[in-house]
């Protein structure tokens, strides 16, 4: 699931590179979704779907991967998509420089397991990819103090 897909990044690219994946791009702007659907048709990407909806209203089965690029703060990204994440799924959010304040504002139960620095050719700006998942529940029988 690519949230706030806009022109289709990274959703269209993921669908093209991973034909075995089913990729859904969701955006609240109908023209952007129409563009993604046109790209899917022109490139014969049968594994790519565009959904015109606000993420809060999207009805869909759970996703193994939920992505965003320039959608919202990390908390505003994970909170409305949490119900759409598969039990073993992960979130991947592209951000500018390492978003320390956003990381600190994540809701309880969300674990950041990797922050990957990115280099974008032609850009001097810092970028990173933040990988998150639901924290593992405590094992039964363990005592926590």
Predicted features along the sequence, with ranges:
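Conserved class I S-adenosyl-L-methionine
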Residues: 1-6
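Conserved SAM-binding loop of SAM-dependent methyltransferases across substrates and taxa
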Residues: 7-20
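S-adenosylmethionine
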Residues: 18-145
